[in-house]
């Protein structure tokens, strides 16, 4: 068995949004990415307001609730400058729904080759856990 290391960061830039390097640089500058679970989309904008007003214009919205996609959309609509990603992404369908909602990066809880390859192909920054 051989292990192949692949640095895919340079492959992730294009028309879909920011490059992987740009997203990672923004995260590095923030120092922390709050991981949030939003059960009700009405909580999304007040949360985004609080994060941005507190100097932390970044969030990873977990895709474990039915409200996640709409929450991402509302957060990006209220704060276009905010870096918003989708976390706990388990399927390619969730990748598509998250990106359509405005997610700028994808986080998966483990390394799923299907999700990573799909994101690379679609030029979506992905952080497999």
Predicted regions mapped to residue ranges:
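Short, Lys/Arg-enriched N-terminal segments with co-localized hydrophobic residues
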Residues: 6-19
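Conserved N-terminal beta1-alpha1 strand-loop-helix module at the mouth
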Residues: 19-101
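Conserved anion-binding
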Residues: 67, 93, 99, 104-129
């Amino acid at each position: 068995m051989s292990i192949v290391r692949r640095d895919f960061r340079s492959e992730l830039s294009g028309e879909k949004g920011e490059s992987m390097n740009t997203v990672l640089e923004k995260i590095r500058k923030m120092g922390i990415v709050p991981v949030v679970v939003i059960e009700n989309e009405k909580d999304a904008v007040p949360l985004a307001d609080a994060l941005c007003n507190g100097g932390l214009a970044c969030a990873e919205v977990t895709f474990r609730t039915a409200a996640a996609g709409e929450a991402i959309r509302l957060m990006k609509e209220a704060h276009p400058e905010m870096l918003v990603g989708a976390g706990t992404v388990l399927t390619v369908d969730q990748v598509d729904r998250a990106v359509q909602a405005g997610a700028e990066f994808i986080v998966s809880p483990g390394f799923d080759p299907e999700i990573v390859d799909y994101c690379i192909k679609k030029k979506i920054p992905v952080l497999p856990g």
